[in-house]
Amino acid sequence: MKGLIDLSLVNGIWTLKLSMIQTVALAIVTLYLGEFIKKHSSFLQRVSMPAPAVGGLPFAFLCAFLSYYKVVNITFDGALQSFLMLAFFTTIGLMASLNVLKKGGVAIIFFWIVCTIWIVFQNGAGIIIAKAMGIEPIFGIMAGSVSMMGGLGTAGAFGPHVEELTGVPGVASAAIAAATFGMVAGTLLGAPVGDRIIKMHNVPTPVDHPELLEADGIDINESDSESKLFDLQSLMHVIAFVGISLGLGTLVSAALSSVFGPLPAYIGAMIVGACIRNYADFTGHISINGAALDAVSNVSLSIFVTMAINSLKLAQLVDLALPLMAILAAQMVLITIFAYLIYWLFKRNYDSVMLGAGAIGFGLGATPNALVNMLSLASKYGPSPKAWLVVSLVGAFLIDFTNAFLITFMAKLI
């Protein structure tokens, strides 16, 4: 067994070091464990809790228990985790099509701007509470837009990056823990707040006024010319574009870092990916299959986030539990206010209610949470195709661009 299992005694505690391959294999096992548990839990399905969190958190707690009682410490090789993180954010860039943005018109740009401004409030509130609670201000940003507006993907990417830059222990684990909390809170809060706004202001809905849908002019069921299926060649094209974006992205990131200071490695890859996507759209010389792109994005995200959660150092969060909960409670209050603000800014109609409910979903968790909130309201009051399109586009990739820059900028200020 020598060479297969790296188990040694370090400072009187047995330490198990998992290789890169073993780390990936474990991530896949816990990912499918999460899928199995979620499949048999109506609550987890209702709140759209991602399988990586469902399977990874129990394992992280087990590791914390074994470490706390000095049974064994388990360490992980995160080399492939970093690569998968870069690949995922590159696919976000490859989704940034200007042609798609045109379908939503001014509403998309306005909603994007409003959500970008809200990032400043999320981080500002987090920093203020962190300082008041006597912890490092950087935890305020980790429990701010990194984990709230950013979700598990951004938390898993920025957490280790910021922890390495600042040298503050527990930063990465705090970001993941806050993002996991936000996934649940975003779904539990969104639809009830939207329902409350509708009833409080007697907002006309499509159920009672079918003409609202006719006036909308957007058909969410309108199929594009692209097949929902993909072949091996389409998949290889996407993988090639991701690889090219990663390579050229290192040069872009280096150039930007020389001007703006240290930036996450994926920024350059996202920018190059967006350039490739729009070159493809406007020239037609190359094609990017959306289904293949989604597949690469989902696989890289699922394994990357599962690896990040598996390696959570929960023991480092014991002293941060109360301050983190205070910050997260404040974020829930603020995002509720934000939903009401969106209602007043966007014509005070049914679309604006749906935008608010969606904003709670991806403002605390992720885009799937936002869509679940909107589906919940739609099942009772009718659909809002325009809001669905706007939230999908802003939450899925647009907000990631501005969030990344604002996180980096505000982190430097503290």
PLM feature segments, named:
Residues T15-V29, T75-F89, I138-S145, F260-V272, ...:
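Structural signature of hydrophobic alpha-helical transmembrane segments
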Residues E211-R277:
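Core mid-bundle transmembrane helix pairs that form the ion/substrate translocation pathway
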